[in-house]
């Protein structure tokens, strides 16, 4: 792992070397000129999927950090700087690395960057993570099919592993769970660990699970996904095993 600075930019890479063109790796225009953009997804901003397996060992997802809500309309992507390790991209990078090393199915962090403003008070942030191949989020799948009992149980076990590490996923919802079609069968992945972190005690775990259930119930009405109380019961049974 290598951490370094170039002018007003700070980088961390999951490699034991620096890169002269490090800035370009976080610019969508660079990858477009290289004809290496293989897809994109819309959220708060655009996540670009990149053909980088020959460079980084895996294909990547490039994401810029944007604010949401009313504040985001006034200040779309600048955050107050206090310490490098607590910046949005560096914090998510380190958390993903911790979970990846613990064996949880999360994207491997590849690199992160922050760029300070002229006064050094604020910064903008970007992150490169592993692209999970042959995968869709649960809401997309559940619009067209039901999922087997074992898949719901797998989700329950995954969340339990996360909670046993005392990690609170602050945006745990159906869109942040991917289902991958792998050789060994279906595999669940967790995404988007921005603003997530360690939390003591157990009181928040039920709230976290309730948040996930509400997200499924919301998408039943909004996207007509196929989700039942029995699905949730299967998930919870595995969680409590």
UniProtKB/Swiss-Prot annotation:
Presence of the UniProt keyword ATP-binding in the record: yes
MF terms in GO: ATP binding; kinase activity; phosphotransferase activity, alcohol group as acceptor
Keyword terms: ATP-binding, Cell inner membrane, Cell membrane, Kinase, Lipopolysaccharide biosynthesis, Membrane, Nucleotide-binding, Transferase
Gene3D superfamilies named among the record's database cross-references: Transferase(Phosphotransferase) domain 1
Reaction(s) the record says it catalyses: an alpha-Kdo-(2->6)-lipid IVA + ATP = a 4-O-phospho-alpha-Kdo-(2->6)-lipid IVA + ADP + H(+)
Membrane topology label: Peripheral membrane protein
SUPFAM superfamilies to which the protein is assigned, alphabetical: Protein kinase-like (PK-like)
One protein family per Pfam: Kdo
EC number(s) per entry: 2.7.1.166
Domain of life assignment: Bacteria
Location relative to the cell: Cell inner membrane
GO cellular component: plasma membrane
Role according to the record: Catalyzes the ATP-dependent phosphorylation of the 3-deoxy-D-manno-octulosonic acid (Kdo) residue in Kdo-lipid IV(A) at the 4-OH position.
Family the UniProt entry places it in: Belongs to the protein kinase superfamily. KdkA/RfaP family.
Protein name: 3-deoxy-D-manno-octulosonic acid kinase
Species, as recorded: Haemophilus influenzae (strain PittEE)
Organism lineage string: Bacteria, Pseudomonadati, Pseudomonadota, Gammaproteobacteria, Pasteurellales
């Amino acid at each position: 792992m290598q951490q370094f600075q170039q002018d007003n930019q700070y980088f961390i890479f999951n490699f034991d070397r620096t890169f002269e063109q490090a800035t370009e790796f976080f610019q969508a225009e660079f990858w477009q000129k290289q004809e290496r953009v293989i897809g994109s997804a819309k959220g708060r901003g655009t996540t670009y999927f990149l053909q980088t397996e020959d460079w980084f060992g895996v294909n990547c997802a490039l994401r810029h950090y944007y604010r949401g809500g009313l504040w985001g309309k006034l200040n779309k992507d600048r955050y107050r700087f206090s310490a490098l390790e607590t910046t949005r991209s560096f914090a998510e990078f380190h958390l993903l690395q911790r979970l990846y090393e613990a064996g949880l199915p999360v994207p491997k962090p590849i690199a992160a960057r922050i760029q300070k403003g002229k006064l050094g008070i604020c910064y903008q942030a970007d992150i490169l993570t592993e692209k999970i191949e042959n995968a869709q989020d649960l809401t997309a799948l559940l619009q067209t099919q039901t999922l087997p009992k074992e898949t719901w149980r797998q989700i329950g076990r995954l969340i339990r592993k996360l909670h046993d590490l005392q990690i609170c996923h602050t945006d745990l919802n159906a869109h942040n769970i991917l289902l991958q079609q792998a050789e060994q069968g279906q595999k669940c992945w967790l995404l988007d660990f921005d603003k997530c972190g360690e939390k003591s005690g157990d009181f928040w775990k039920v709230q976290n699970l309730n948040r996930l259930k509400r997200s499924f119930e919301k998408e039943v009405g909004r996207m007509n996904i196929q989700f039942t109380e029995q699905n949730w019961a299967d998930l919870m049974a595995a969680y409590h095993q």
